[in-house]
Amino acid sequence: MLSKLLRLGEGRIVKRLKRVAEYVNTLSDNVEKLTDVELKAKTDEFKQRLADEKNPESLDDLLPEAFAVAREAAWRVLDQRPFDVQVMGGAALHLGNVAEMKTGEGKTLTCVLPAYLNALAGKGVHIVTVNDYLAKRDSEWMGRVHRFLGLQVGVILASMTPDERRVAYNADITYGTNNEFGFDYLRDNMAHSLDDLVQRGHSYAIVDEVDSILIDEARTPLIISGSADGASNWYTEFARLVRLMDKDVHYEVDLRKRTVGVHEKGMEFVEDQLGIDNLYEVANSPLVSYLNNALKAKELFNRDKDYIVRDGEVLIVDEFTGRVLIGRRYNEGMHQAIEAKEHVEIKAENQTLATITLQNYFRLYDKLAGMTGTAQTEAAELHEIYKLGVVAIPTNKPMIREDRSDLIYKTEEAKYMAVVDDVAERYEKGQPVLIGTTSVERSEYLSRQFTKRHIPHNVLNAKYHEQEAGIVAVAGRRGGVTVATNMAGRGTDIVLGGNVDFLTDQRLRRRGLDPVETPDEYEQAWHSELPKVKEEAGQEAAEVIEAGGLYVLGTERHESRRIDNQLRGRSGRQGDPGESRFYLSLGDELMRRFHGATLEALLTRLNLPDDVPIEAKMVTRAIKSAQTQVEQQNFEVRKNVLKYDEVMNQQRKVIYAERRRILEGESLQQQALGMVRDVITAYIDGATTDSYVEDWDLDALWSALGTLYPVGIKHESLTHADEDSECDELSRDELLEALLIDAQHAYAAREAELAELAGEGAMRQLERNVLLNVVDRKWREHLYEMDYLKEGIGLRAMAQRDPLVEYQREGYDMFMAMLDGVKEESVGFLFNLAVEAVPASHVAPVEIPEGFTGLVADVEAIRPREEASSALRTKDIDNESTGLTYSGPSEDGSTQVQLNSGGGQKTPAGIPVGASRRERREAARRRGRGAKPSRSVKKR
């Protein structure tokens, strides 16, 4: 219903965009007359008009002229002139909408127009793609247009150094993947120097395949983590146990909800095997998680469908695209359970150091827009989460593809035999065929069947995705047969007769030409080679059209209608003929999860042979209903992820703002003195809770304060015994005032001591380093605590409490306690940290520490306002660097992990190898408490 309401004003928006395109057309004649130099000069003219102090123009004012200029530049450079519908799409993107443009309508070229316009403001434009290949390709291909107009274009790739990233972000337009943009944001907020920052703000982003990135991948947060412990023997032990357990005897499985439940008989079996009395005793509670994960690994995660095993490593397969997600690992011990199941090396679990969801990352942008071929089914979610409207842009030519009704077979074997027969028939007449499967296993099974029938074909799946662009580019040629695990986010058009741009680029690269390295030679060769390729491809395209165009054959319905529509959408681009059909069976996962028994009963009553299909509207309705249910479930999951992350998001904003303030060189003297005041006040409040002065344990208070700073007064001097009482009445306020004055004197003495040691401004330098390192360490500990809290918060529902409300309340309490801890530890370090002077020229660059291993001062990195003649260095610090792990949504699917080398991984002191999360948490708490002076100083 909400989707329908959101579409009510769509017609008016499309009419408005059409008027924009018509106005741009009226400017075309004048723009065409400009020379190349004059066309390029328009960029500087537009910038001056934006910056005019007397009568500045807005980007909206410049839109028609800027679009006309960019359109003409695209024609001169690429031999491609954006159609009116592409101009409409560009205007929709500039206005902050999602432009729904069907496959083959030229989304990549459309993006050039709003990117050029918004780059004129000088704040940077980020263009987000689904993988590194597309980011590099588009930055080179479309970057030719922008460079022709005098703009700088950068690209962010996973392999780049921070210096290379900084250059790319300083360009006018920056291409990259959602993961790279997000991880750079997190890394910037882990940096120890302004010089380490790479991003320069979040002004405007255009997200390609916006539904894939903002919807499908939104369930998976971006996480930077470090090693937390070694592998546990419990994973292996429970993998052995569950192999001995029987489904429906020891445990039950719900495929629809993807859950497992252990029966009483199963618990007794595990208890007998482990020799324990009660699995659910507090001491044994970590074992329950191992058992549940082992059962899920056995029943819910299937080899060659959900993951593959390659070179002794478990690699996750993306459910949406069928690609291998190199390095991706499930959280909460799930990946270790699968490794134990497959008898491969069990790798250590990680501890979160920084995290953000894609929803909250993209909401950082002042303006956000996106492009996709399928967005209407998700219009409500895009509006609710991101405040993005969806505008359906008309196709340039009418769609004439024929979408055939589904064929349903009783068995999977009969279905696949029918698929092979159909493909063989199409191949004989020269019609190209694209077959979509949902798993690597199915694609390889079909490949073997085609080989038996001597049908030449290409396989495009998780195991061979390196060659995917080349395979897709020729998938529309005569007699081409392509088997693909899924077609979401492939990024290369299937053009009848072959993709002309790709084939031309391929030929030029074989000759050693590159659009970035050798731009002049490349441009010259492009214009001479392109007509030849067009002529060759045009002749073949005519033959393919005669044969019926591209035939898309789906072998299974996906749980998302969008993925099905994306597969269909590969055929019938730009008014070409085409055809699509889905072959289904009762063994398909969607059928088994929803209404499988009903459909099987229907086929049994009809008494049809296995190889005879049925076409029934009832089945189509059942499938649509099932897909709608799954989509709604996934929407609820994503909303739930966002609700929980919103708690962290508010806390993250506070911490990141504080870090940035420290980095940017503001004087922290008043803040440090404020911390001293707050901590001493808290100690005194803890010591004076008893109403009678004689009950105060001032000796304990002085002892505790002595661990913070060198106390210069004795409490005896504050009290004077007389004849009538043990001591004069001493008020809490008098005690506080005396100690605060004493602490201020001690702080001034500490500052003088450091000034003598390392020169004027040394104390400011120490303040900056102490606060930065303490904030980082306490924030990491807090993330760990919040992970643990969220892990078990769902159990609060059993006590009739809302888990989200409980998470918000306890998360807030933990955050405030963390801030108190930051103050307490910072004060202790400021007064007591042993430092030495080091000539500034000999100071090594500061490395980002894995944990709180020390405070390293660096004049250049920290940039204090008052320069010290020498740098400060803490003594007896073991600087340990540990490799970081980057976990987030895959390039165009669910999740991936990227490892960053950085020294040997060590288990933190005091934490046993193989420790459970609960054990690690308690050890971390004990370790953290060791450095803190106790506040409990009341007299007993």
Swiss-Prot record:
Q: Where is the composition biased (Basic residues)?
A: 923-940
Gene Ontology CC terms: cell envelope Sec protein transport complex; cytosol; plasma membrane
CDD domains assigned? DEXDc_SecA, SF2_C_secA
Indicate how the chain sits in the lipid bilayer: Peripheral membrane protein
Q: Where is this region: Disordered?
A: 867-940
Query: What are the alphabetically sorted keywords of the record?
Result: ATP-binding, Cell membrane, Cytoplasm, Membrane, Nucleotide-binding, Protein transport, Translocase, Translocation, Transport
Coiled-coil ranges from the UniProt annotation: none
Give the chief site where it resides: membrane
Tell me its family.
Belongs to the SecA family.
Its name, as the record gives it, is Protein translocase subunit SecA 1
Organism of origin is Mycobacterium leprae (strain TN)
Upper classification of the organism: Bacteria, Bacillati, Actinomycetota, Actinomycetes, Mycobacteriales
Gene from which this protein is expressed:
secA1
